[in-house]
Amino acid sequence: MNDVENLKPADKFVSVDGLKLRYIEAGSGPSVLFLHGASLGSSADVFLRNLGPFAKAGFRAVAFDYPGFGLSDVPTKQSTAQQRNSIPKFIDAAGLAKTALIAHSRSGGFAVQLALEDPSRYSHVIILGTGSLLPPQTQEQVGKYEAVQARVDREMAQKEPTVDDARKLLQADTFNHSLISDEDVALRHRSMIGRNFKAHQDRQNQEAPAAGGASQAKPLWQRLTELKMPLLIIFGREDRAHAGERAELLKNTHPELKIHIVNGCKHMVHWDAFDDLMRHGVPFLQS
């Protein structure tokens, strides 16, 4: 599972709104689209260890780089709304038709928004570690994490990261550090420097705070039960911002939701909880 380079499929590209978007895929069958997060260096490569196993399970497993991430073109003006809207446009350009979404981190909010807006396009939704889809933190929980995260975000936008910075970032988000190979670090660092770093800096200045653009009258976590397609949610108990406790609260509040909370798992759910994702995700998608 650590020999990432040997698992890497060929880079492919499609054109969306005049931008060249890079994607990787494996297998054939019903489409499953993996959506990466928003931190510096995020790209389709974070799913390299997941595509092959899902392909072997009978799916066309696909992951793409959002505009401004990885090897995709960088738009003149970036926004979270543009990233979200690139998802259905990529689906059309890549010929995925009706597809399941496996969304990590901030992309979970995108997936839920899109599935609520046009349920006919999406067969299933799997959410991995999306904190914005949990009940908010209590006053007692808010504090140290936010201060540390704000400092890290500022530092990441000030100086181009080193290879060691890339390793530390992965270690901070992964419970089992033995999963992090030199190849993982090299791939992450590649997507953190050069034009990607400049794009990250630009996003800090251009992005609106809400993933959907306008403020929402009802938080997305309160709308999860409105989804028309099957929904599976997986969180790491040791994830940031008390995610484990908040996931327990959501599970107790809405026992009808399929929520799995994995011990020994931080934010990189698809790495730390690889076996859990396969064990729960494959039969869920086959249902």
Label for each model-derived stretch:
Residues 15-71:
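Conserved HGGG/HGGXW glycine-rich cap/lid loop of the alpha/beta-hydrolase fold
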Residues 47, 184, 220, 229, ...:
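Short alpha-helix in the alpha/beta-hydrolase fold that links the catalytic acid
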Residues 56, 63-102, 106, 136, ...:
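Active-site loop/oxyanion-hole signature of alpha/beta-hydrolase fold enzymes
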Residues 112, 116, 123-162, 168:
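Flexible "cap/lid" loop of the alpha/beta hydrolase fold
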Residues 142, 159-225:
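Conserved alpha/beta-hydrolase catalytic His-Asp/Glu region
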Residues 227, 233-235:
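Short beta-strand/loop motif that positions the catalytic acidic residue
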Residues 237-242:
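Acidic catalytic loop of the alpha/beta-hydrolase fold
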Residues 255-287:
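Catalytic active-site module of serine/aspartate enzymes centered on a nucleophile-bearing elbow/loop
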